[in-house]
Amino acid sequence: MSKVYLVRHGQTAWNVGEIFRGRADIPLDETGKQEVHLAGEALKDETLHAVYSSPLSRSMETAENIAKFHKIPVTPFDPIIDISYGEWEGLENQVVKEKYPELHALWQREPHKIKFPGGESLDEVRSRTIKGLEDLLAKHKDENFVLVAHRVPNKVICCALLGLDNSHFWRIQQDTASTNLFIHRNGQWIIAFLNDTSYLKSLGKPSLSDF
């Protein structure tokens, strides 16, 4: 049996400003730094054998706040890097609505049918993240590990492990610094919990939109 903790990075200024992040290397803001410290504390008593992170700094800093309690290194893991938004990267959501009205509407309505201009599709993200997860399961047989990634990869992984296709993307919530727990036993996935942020209550921050 293996436990896989899937964590989203902490808050950045671009989350608050509803700016498409993707491969842009945006650091955590002060709230994000507080969030990831609490996320790390929430997992400090768990038995963890490895911590993997998207190579982007917002995820790496989140992962380091988890790994430090277990005295294990953080391993950058390219398969879980954020989606490439291509031409949308660095643009505010409202700007994208105005510049790409039909494509933005399709993204909101049928996200599985869109490929971002100069970027990726959800199917491409699913292919690389699930292949990466399978490789780690083979490497860490009967061990527990953490993956720290981003909103889109996390939602796609959750859909896959729930047996859902990518059309269900918007039905999965992934708040900043949230944790999901999946248990792999006898070749099957068991979902223990999704989008846990109970450890962030002390911050008293308002909920952001799904961005």
Identify what each model region corresponds to.
Residues 5, 75-77, 192:
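General small-molecule cofactor/ligand-binding pocket signal
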Residues 192-211:
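Acidic, His/Gly-rich catalytic cores of divalent-metal-dependent hydrolytic chemistry
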Residues 2, 47-49, 141-145:
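Short coil/turn segments at beta-strand junctions that form active-site/ligand-binding loops
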Residues 5-62, 69, 115-130:
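Loop-to-helix element that buttresses phosphate recognition and phosphoryl-transfer chemistry
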Residues 60, 131-190:
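Active-site-adjacent alpha-helix immediately C-terminal to a catalytic or transition-state-stabilizing loop
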Residues 10, 151, 197:
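Active-site metal-binding loops of divalent metal-dependent hydrolases
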Residues 19, 79-80, 109-114:
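Short linear capping/connector segments at secondary-structure termini
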Residues 37-104:
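Phosphate-coordination/substrate-recognition cap region in phosphate-metabolizing enzymes
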